Amino acid sequence: MNASRIAAAGASTLTRRIIPCLDVTAGRVVKGVNFVNLTDAGDPVEIARRYNEQGADELTFLDITATSDGRDLILPIIEQVASQVFIPLTVGGGVRQVSDVQRLLNAGADKISINSAAVANPELVRAAADYHGSQCIVVAIDARRSSAEGEPARWEVFTHGGRKATGLDAVAWARRMAAYGAGEILLTSMDRDGTKSGFDLELTRAVSDAVPVPVIASGGVGNLQHLADGVTTGRASAVLAASIFHFGQHTVRECKQYMAERGIAVRLT
């Protein structure tokens, strides 16, 4: 991590972070609803540069079909972005072994997100954290509500871009991954993804309260209040969004100003 990224990461530990998410497939940024019906949103390098200029705290790149398609890592895209963007980059998709973590770090990533491979081989998370440090390792959890109305809330973990049910309880899985060395949990509600109806705040709060590491709330942001709710009601350390940024509804700067006006500590530039 270069000096400017270290400074950005250090400042963000004292504030709530706003993180644009770039879902990538076939070299393009896409956005769907409930993990399907993908719409092209543009070139990843151009979009990353725009969010960097708007004052994003970090960027998250997720190759959403790398694992299901059996493809390699998106190294060329990350190399291009890292040469032009000076905030922390989290990259996920197609990570299968510790050597993949090293390859992405060498390409310019600052943190590596592990999702399907963590379920297939939980020891990968422990090994990667032991070798590279927990601060580099993010475990991504895609969760869908599995409890019926009136029952105690439960959420099931899905892998392979939301295509494969695992039978794992999301809260228990998050707790286990934190114990294995994950430095952050990236928590996406599959039920809310792309719906613009707001985070699943019950899910976000349940996981945030269960783990001793930062939780990044994801899935469902449709307006500025949703971002604030993720922090205040969901108790997330960071909020991640895509649609409201990609299609010009709001800028990162507008989101930060809104949160600051409501007493939420954010990094203003």
UniProtKB/Swiss-Prot annotation:
The keyword Lipid metabolism does not apply. The keyword Lyase applies. It is found in: Cytoplasm. GO terms for biological process: L-histidine biosynthetic process. GO terms for molecular function: imidazoleglycerol-phosphate synthase activity; lyase activity. It is an enzyme of class 4 (lyase). The active site is at residues 23, 142. Keywords: Amino-acid biosynthesis, Cytoplasm, Histidine biosynthesis, Lyase. It catalyses: 5-[(5-phospho-1-deoxy-D-ribulos-1-ylimino)methylamino]-1-(5-phospho-beta-D-ribosyl)imidazole-4-carboxamide + L-glutamine = D-erythro-1-(imidazol-4-yl)glycerol 3-phosphate + 5-amino-1-(5-phospho-beta-D-ribosyl)imidazole-4-carboxamide + L-glutamate + H(+). Heterodimer of HisH and HisF. Belongs to the HisA/HisF family. This is Imidazole glycerol phosphate synthase subunit HisF. It comes from Bordetella pertussis (strain Tohama I / ATCC BAA-589 / NCTC 13251).
